[in-house]
Amino acid sequence: MERLTVTLGERSYPITIAAGLFNDPASFWPLRAGDQTMLVTNETLAPLWLDKVRSALEQAGVKVDQVILPDGEQYKSLAVLETVFSALLEKPHGRDTTLIALGGGVIGDLTGFAAACYQRGVRFIQVPTTLLSQVDSSVGGKTAVNHPLGKNMIGAFWQPASVVVDLDCLQTLPARELASGLAEVIKYGIILDRDFFLWLEENIDALLALDGAAMAYCIRRCCEIKADVVAADERESGMRALLNLGHTFGHAIEAEMGYGNWLHGEAVAAGMVMAARAAERLGQFETQDVERIIALLKRAGLPVTGPETMPPQAYLPHMMRDKKVLAGELRLVLPLAIGKSEVRGGVPHDLVLSAIADCQQA
């Protein structure tokens, strides 16, 4: 078992990583006998994990209600959020309740935002079931729902009480979802950890085969990096923005193509190549390193080009709604080398369009 801590003073919390955690009632710290909870999951995951998690909680004397939502990015919306609020109010649940997010990034983001809003804030626990959520979205307190005009535009910073990562969940993960998660894994190597990127080049096949030791190390290392970044910059005023490599381009793809048609990691993968091409055109990133990124993404089963039906000009309106835009200026996360990156403003729009076009022709 691995246990890490996200250090945020009195709001610090543990990340527990191991196989078989759902079998142990003690995994769901800080819940105690008599606590009231609302377990939020989706229609795909409920048959797989709901009974197991519910049983563990009830063994510990925890009171469990549940709400089962439709599955898909298109349901990460205000309308579905209201479904969660209605379930909480109908019981009713008070300010001392705990929400439990059992699912991937959509469930985690939506449940976390519900927790941030309900009665002006209640406790919640992240129980991520996808690789993407285990290595990224469950850690750090970013919660949100989407708007038709932009991804994650309505949300709050609201830290969980704990994160419970049961490695057994990956055994039921579809191959496409596994690849999507690997995009965020590869991102960490590009932005902050060259040695980890080199390790990924050597071990990507083991991760695709769900090798237990390789996957445990991979998730732990990603969570270590994320925890350190969040501890240093919780509200994304500086260093934390580096975690958005590829996301400005990727969110544009998701919004333009319709939420759910491209998985988040797929869009981020294409976006990271676009960011690398932009950095290459600026003369700050070597062509051979662009090719290494492309090669690793391809081996992970990820796209390295944008949608054929989305011309470069379609990206900019979405990109200008990005949360990193300041005073009307587009700011991009760009690599400087494998393992080093920066947030850069003032990148000419023509250069951005050319970088996107480079990827369309790849």
From Swiss-Prot:
Its EC number is 4.2.3.4. PANTHER family: 3-DEHYDROQUINATE SYNTHASE, 3-DEHYDROQUINATE SYNTHASE, CHLOROPLASTIC. It comes from Cronobacter sakazakii (strain ATCC BAA-894). It catalyses: 7-phospho-2-dehydro-3-deoxy-D-arabino-heptonate = 3-dehydroquinate + phosphate. Its main location: cytoplasm. InterPro entries: Dehydroquinate_synthase, DHQ_synth_AroB, DHQ_synth_fam, DHQS/DOIS_N, DHQS_C. GO terms for biological process: amino acid biosynthetic process; aromatic amino acid family biosynthetic process; chorismate biosynthetic process. NAD(+) binds at residues 71-76, 105-109, 129-130, 142, 151, 169-172. This is 3-dehydroquinate synthase. The lineage of its organism: Bacteria, Pseudomonadati, Pseudomonadota, Gammaproteobacteria, Enterobacterales. GO terms for molecular function: 3-dehydroquinate synthase activity; metal ion binding; nucleotide binding. The keyword ATP-binding does not apply. HAMAP family: DHQ_synthase. It comes from the Bacteria. GO terms for cellular component: cytoplasm. Keywords: Amino-acid biosynthesis, Aromatic amino acid biosynthesis, Cobalt, Cytoplasm, Lyase, Metal-binding, NAD, Nucleotide-binding, Zinc. Binds 1 divalent metal cation per subunit. Can use either Co(2+) or Zn(2+). It is found in: Cytoplasm. Its cofactor is Co(2+); Zn(2+); NAD(+).
